[in-house]
Curated annotation (Swiss-Prot):
SS bonds (residue pairs): 74-81
Organism: Aplysia californica (California sea hare)
Biological process (GO), any one: neuropeptide signaling pathway
Name of the protein described by the UniProt record: Neuroactive polyprotein R15
Subcellular location: Secreted
Misc: Isoform R15-1 produces peptide R15 alpha-2 which is a 24 aa long spliced form of peptide R15 alpha-1 which is produced by isoform R15-2.
Domain of life: Eukaryota
Tissue specificity comment: Expressed within the abdominal ganglion in neurons R15, RB(HE), the two L9(G) gill motoneurons, and L40 interneuron, all are parts of autonomic control circuit that contributes to implementing a central command to coordinate autonomic activity with escape locomotion.
GO cellular component, one term: extracellular region
Lineage, top ranks: Eukaryota, Metazoa, Spiralia, Lophotrochozoa, Mollusca
Keywords attached to this entry: Cleavage on pair of basic residues, Disulfide bond, Neuropeptide, Pyrrolidone carboxylic acid, Secreted, Signal
Leader peptide range in chain numbering: 1-26
């Protein structure tokens, strides 16, 4: 092939590459710009009924507490409540907020208990890791036999 034929092939491949890129980039870009502006109406279909307040919560006595205006939107599902508590009366709300760290009457574990379990688990993992390090030291030095204390500690 002569240089003119190579030049034409190069130009043709360059044009096809540009057209292909435009065809892949243009539709998603135009779709993104044609969407409505994000607002309340645009996301209304993504919310469930328990996430949207219909105004009736303002009339319920257990959704406000005092002049601070503490509102709870946990009428239907306890996952919406702070700390996962389902509260049905104002006195229950006050008790739940005051005794947040104690085991509640709702059957939920307190924060202190969960952190205690986590700490215990971490301690157990550290003990296991320490035992593995000791075992590896014993394996790496075969000429030194472990004492009876080391063996007893490893198998406890």
């Amino acid at each position: 092939m002569d240089s003119a034929g190579l030049h034409i092939n190069f130009r043709l491949s360059h044009v096809l590459t540009v057209v292909t890129c435009i065809l892949y980039i243009l539709p998603p870009t135009t779709t993104a710009y044609s969407l409505p502006a994000p607002g309340k109406a645009a996301f209304q279909h993504q919310l469930s009924k328990r996430d949207v307040s219909d105004g009736s919560a303002e009339r319920r006595p257990y959704t406000r507490m005092g002049s601070g205006g503490l509102k709870l939107h946990c009428q239907v599902h306890p996952a919406n409540c702070p700390g996962g508590l389902m509260v049905t009366k104002k006195s229950d709300l006050l008790g739940a907020l005051l005794s947040r760290n104690s085991p509640s009457s709702y059957g939920l574990p307190s924060r202190d208990m969960s952190t205690a379990y986590k700490r215990q688990d971490v301690r157990q993992q550290l003990r296991m890791f320490d035992d593995l390090v000791q075992l590896r030291k014993l394996i790496e030095t075969p000429s030194v036999y472990p004492s009876e204390e080391d063996e007893a500690r490893l198998y406890d």
